[in-house]
Regions:
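An alpha-helical, amphipathic repeat domain used for nucleic-acid recognition
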Residues: 1-159
Length: 159
């Protein structure tokens, strides 16, 4: 029950090609191979070989993706966790990469997101909803909105 368009392309070759483009979790790689109609046994064998040669490593892939999102300063910790969970990484593994003192970073990121989206303080509720949709906690949201309003007031005074 192989793919009809290229019968000699094995699950291992397909998985290797997928991993060459981007690291995937084991769960996501299994899904992608299943969608391509490879038999379960062939998928299991391919995954086993990829793990053996360390081409497939959930911890490495999760850490790399976490760092990329964390360093970009565009995502809340909750949003990073949700994206990684959706990508097939286990919650325990995701939590392993969370720094313990991320609140200061969260406030800084929320403030920068507000500055990028809003050029002047508009409706406070709209700003709060925007940050809430990004996954920020209420205390971070209120603090960032207050800081944004003060920053905008100071900019207006200087003009």
């Amino acid at each position: 029950m192989r793919r009809q368009n290229n019968p000699e392309r094995t699950a291992l070759i397909c998985a290797t090609d997928l991993l060459a483009r981007q690291d995937h979790s084991e769960v996501r790689l299994r899904q992608k191979l299943a969608v391509r109609k490879y038999p379960k046994e062939e998928i299991d064998d391919a995954i086993e070989k990829l793990k053996k040669y360390n081409y497939l490593n959930d911890e490495r892939a999760c850490g790399y993706q976490f760092d990329m999102m964390y360093q970009s300063n565009r995502y809340s910790m909750r949003q990073i966790s949700a994206k990684l969970f959706t990508a097939g990484f286990k919650e325990e593994l995701i939590n392993k990469f969370k720094p313990e003192d991320y609140e200061e970073r969260e406030e800084r990121v929320a403030f920068h997101l507000l500055k990028a989206k809003y050029k002047n303080p508009t409706d406070i509720r709209k700003m709060q909803q925007f940050l809430y949709a990004k996954g920020f906690e209420y205390s971070i949201i209120t603090s960032a909105v207050e800081k944004f309003q003060l920053d905008m007031e100071n900019d207006n005074i200087e003009r």
